[in-house]
Design a protein with these regions (language model features):
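Conserved N-terminal phosphate-binding loop of PLP-dependent enzymes in the Aspartate aminotransferase
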Residues: 4-136
Length: 136
């Protein structure tokens, strides 16, 4: 729908089925205490991310809650290192968003410690493989 000079909404906005789905999701988040589960797991996730600092191509790691960013040292031109590192991580079995030379990691709120361990292990493999490929 249009409101004067601004576009507002999407094709699914305000449709009863979409509203019902949104309310159902909110009920599940409340019933299963999803946000508190994520809050309790976030220190473990952040600790896992920080454990990757020892890899030589990692420039900086930062995070908050269940979200983290890993800056990969720039190589030749901006964005190239991040994209190439992302491909190595994807080949190692982990998928996420890479923007420029930053790997953005945001696990599902419903994950468990074993999933965090798997994510960190695959990130370590992918980033290490990227580092080795630079040396060849």
């Amino acid at each position: 729908m249009c409101i004067r000079d601004r576009f507002h909404g999407y094709t699914y906005s305000g449709i009863p089925v979409s509203v019902a789905a949104g309310l159902a999701v909110q009920d599940i988040f409340e019933k299963d205490d999803i946000f508190n589960r994520a809050k309790n797991l976030s220190p473990y996730f952040q600790e896992g991310l920080m454990s990757l600092k020892d890899i030589d191509v990692v420039d900086n790691i930062r995070g908050y809650g269940m979200m983290g960013g890993i800056d990969i040292k720039m190589h030749k031109k901006p964005g190239a290192a991040g994209f190439t590192c992302f491909k190595h991580c994807y080949d190692a079995g982990v998928n996420f968003k890479a923007t420029g030379d930053c790997l953005i990691i945001a696990p599902m709120f419903i994950c468990e410690k074993k999933h965090i361990d798997e994510i960190i292990e695959k990130l370590r493999t992918g980033i290490t493989n990227y580092s080795k490929s630079k040396k060849n």
